[in-house]
Amino acid sequence: MLAAEREDWIASFRDSDQLMPLYDRSGARTTYAELLAAAPRDSADRVTESKMAAAYDRTFAAVAELKRQIDATSLDVLIIAGDDQHELFHDTMMPALAIYYGKTIRNAAQQDVPHENWYGRAQMQRLEPERDAHYPVHANLALHFIEGLVARDFDVCAVGGLTAEQHEGHAYSYIHRTYLEGRHLPVVPLLLNTYYPPNQVTPQRCVQFGRHLRELIASYPEDLRVGIIASGGLSHFVVDEELDLGVITALKTKNLDHLARLDPKRLQAGSSEIRGWIVAAAAATDLDLQWLEYIPAYRTPALTGIGMAFARWS
């Protein structure tokens, strides 16, 4: 939704959501028709044009505020905890956890898309408007993570570069194109398999991963100002406010036990991206959650949509 225009929030998703694979709030496969039949009577009132426009405005105000806060931190490096959705990895080889340590990472240039293809146009916003970009990676810090994790009995996949046709996935390109626009801040991409069975990383493992990252940041010999960002939503593509608010409460109170005990069955499809938030929270236990904005962005009467969350620890 973050790449879509206001009019697409209001109208276009109503059709596309009826065709996509969906999971209910228990994590079971379901259909749009089944969700619509089970929705409360007032569900249509949650997706009026005015309410969806207001959700759009709140969301992009939060995006702008998070960008402002990132700009103000004077970071030396930004760790991106994201998920790869068949962009670099496929079912032929899907690591549960990977760290990219090449010196740069490529984002591709946009391709021409027919104007009537609103979804394709939205997808292109993740790519570069004119030519490929090669963004800097803090390779030494990435290698420090890889070597330190292996020493801690963490079997992490090491990714040293891309083939000519590959480029970074949207969890990473969105950060570059939106929050780091115009900057050449080095990053360290963490690639989590949140989406795809049979080896989705567990919430407990995400907590362990984040804790180890915090230790390794502290032990790095160079004095760096390091940030970590979770790139991904809370619940989607069925909004689950109960799940989201439980996660948010745990973030505020640093309740890693709650996050570790989240039922993996509920973390399917887009909701699986909560795992990235778990990694970031576990890496930031020495910091306090200073700001958070949550928008349950419903987009159909079946209550599909995305639980949008934006936060800052410091």
Q: Which residues does each PLM region occupy?
A:
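Flexible, D/E/H-enriched segments
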Residues: M1-T73, A98-R211, E215-S219, V239-S314
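Glycine-rich loop at the start of a catalytic domain that most often binds anionic cofactors/ligands
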Residues: H90-I99
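Divalent-metal (often Zn2+) His-rich catalytic cores of metallo-beta-lactamase-fold enzymes
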Residues: G232-S235, E241
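Catalytic metal-binding/acid-base residues of hydrolase active sites
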Residues: D84-H86, L234-S235
